[in-house]
Amino acid sequence: MLAGLLAESHLMPLEQLPAKVGEHAEPAGLAHVAIYLTDLQRHVLRNLAGEGMGGCRHSVHTAELRIEGTVPGRAFQYGRLLPAASACPGKYRWWAPLLGGTERLGVLRATTEGDDPRTRQDVQLLADVVALIVVSKRDYSDAYARLIRTDTMNVAAEMLWRLLPPRAYSDGRVVISATLEPAYRVGGDAFDYVLDGPLIHLSIFDAMGHDMAAGLTAGLAMGACRNARRRNAELVEITEEIEKVLVEQFGGTRYATGIVARLNTGTGLLEWVNRGHHPPVLIRGSRWVTQLACPPGDPMGTGLGVAPEVCREQLEPGDRLVLYTDGITEARTDTGGEFGLSGFIDFLIRQHADRVPVPETLCRFMHRVVDHHVGEWQDDATVLFCEWLGSSPDRRDLAAAVAGVPLLRSATDAASAETSGIDGELPLRPDAMAPEHSS
C-alpha cells in the first residue's frame, strides 16, 4: 500500500491525492478514506476532494468540519488517532492526525473491518505518508492555497507567509511553535527559526507600521538575518547587517525592532541581542516567570548608532522561552482594557499544566486574542515559543508528549497498552464515539 502510493506520488499533482490514496488503501483494508486539511487560522477542516458520497449508504464526505467540539477536531488538536461512530454497520471509523513533522496539517478518515493494534497502526502510517506527500506538493499548488483560506489575503501577508518557516518543529532537544495574527492582514511582524547542529537560531521582528511597507521591512529583515547567519556572522553582526540593509533601502524612514537569539541545545546556554524589542519571557516550572533583562540597542533601520550587547542566560531542562510582539499585550477587550502580558503568561502556564500540546496551546491563545480584539487591528500579534527539553536528541517520548505527536510502536506493544491505538493516545472519553460533527 505505502510503497505503491509513494512511487506514484513523484508524478502526482495534489488534486489527484485523494483518489490515489483510495486506490492503494482499499485493497489493504482501509476503506472510504478522506483527507481533511486545516484552514490557516485552524478553525475548520476542509475536504481536499470537496463534498461527495462515501462508500456506505448515507455516508457523506462532508466538505467542512469544525475543529472545536468534534472528534476529528480533537484528533487534530491533540495529535492522536481517535475512533468515531461509523456509518457502516459492523465497521470501525478512525480519525488520524496529518503531521508534517510536528506541524498540524489536518486529519485523515478511514473505515476498517477491525480495531486491532495492527489496523490502528496501518491507519496512522497511511496518514503519515499522506502528510509527507501533502507537504511535498503544497508549495506549488494554488488549489491548496485556496482550500486553506477562509478570507481574502492582502499582498503583504501573501509575501510574509511564503517567507515564514512552519509554525511547529520538535526533536528530542527542543519544541518550537509560533503563531501570528491577523493571518490575512498581517503587515510588519515576522518570526524565524533554524537548526545548525546543536544550535537553534530564533528571531522575531516587528516592523514599523501595518501596511505594505511594513511587510517589505519585515521581509528584508528576515532576508538580511538569514544571509548574515549563513555567513557565520555573530549575533551583533547579524543585527548590524539588518540595520545596514534597512538604512540602504529606506534611508532611515523605516525600522524594525527585534530579537536575534541562539540556543545551544548541548549546554542550555541562551544568547541574544535585543534591538528595541520587548524582552524575552522565561517560564520555569509551573509558576516562576521572569523577563530576561538586556540593555537594548536601537531599532534596526534608524541608524542611531546605539551599540547592542550580547546577553546570556543559562537555561534548565524544561524551561520555556517566549518571544512576542506588541499586538499580543495590546489586544483590547470589549470593555476597552488590554489583554496584558500577565494574562498572556497565565494562559500559557495553565495550558501547560493541563498537558495541552504546545501548538494547540498557541492556537487556543491566538483564538482568544482574536476574540478579545475589537475593531481594526492596529498592530500584528506574534508569538514564538521554544521549550528546551535537554541536551539529548533521543528524548523522543518527551518531545512527542509536549508537541502532541503520535509515536508508533509495534503491534505487540500497542496491544499491551492500557489505551487503545497509537502509543501515548489520550484515554478514551465518553464523547469519543460521538458524531464526528455537530450541528
What are these regions (language model features)?
Residues 208-232:
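Acidic, glycine-rich loop-and-beta core segments that form the ion-binding/anion-interacting portion
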Residues 82-86, 90-100, 104:
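A short, aliphatic-rich beta-strand micro-motif
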